[in-house]
Amino acid sequence: MGRLVRLTEQGFIDLVASLSRAARGPRGAGWRPVLGIGDDAAVLPSAGRLHTLLTTDLLTDGVHFRAAWTPGFLLGKKALSVNLSDIAAMGGVPRACVFSDGFPRRTRPAYARDVARGLADQARRHGLAIVGGDTCAARSLFLNVALLGAVEPGREVRRSGARAGDGLYVTGALGAAAAGL
């Protein structure tokens, strides 16, 4: 068995980038993402008038939140909100999402229902559809949302586009996520 190595955040980013290089997508027909790894969302070409935005975020108990401290309703809202902020940062409009979760067997059913209610409430508030998902038993609670959005070609806001003098806007309390709130 190999030696266990702890990955840093940059190590995880590098791992994802290497996976991207290994799997470039459909062959032929010139399909390529407009913008891939390294921004808030991928920008994908579309047959329609708008480009498709795709983002995903995974939240894990003990890393991104503490289930013992976090009401289920707020956790469900957070799971979608972290993805909504990625689409907004790219200048896009959210359209639809899929949601996956893993709950420990000891989880109270009311807590799981509250998570689902929080996610559904946030989806309604932003006019987007929940179109599917998956669930499983897990050792520790995790939630994952993949969100599709839309943006006009050439209008996506990229991280590389920031310039001196641009406005920077913050919602919520700085450091709250790191504090598990």
What are these model-derived regions, one by one?
Residues 42-45, 84-85, 162:
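Short amphipathic alpha-helices and their capping/turn segments at secondary-structure boundaries
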Residues 59, 93-181:
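Glycine-rich anion-binding loops of enzyme active sites
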Residues 11-14, 81, 163:
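Active-site-proximal helix/loop capping residues that flank conserved catalytic or ligand/cofactor
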Residues 38, 70-74, 78, 110, ...:
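Residues at secondary-structure transition points
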Residues 1-71, 90, 99, 114, ...:
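Extreme N-terminal cap/leader segments of soluble proteins
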Residues 73-90:
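Alpha-helical scaffold segments that flank or form the walls of functional sites
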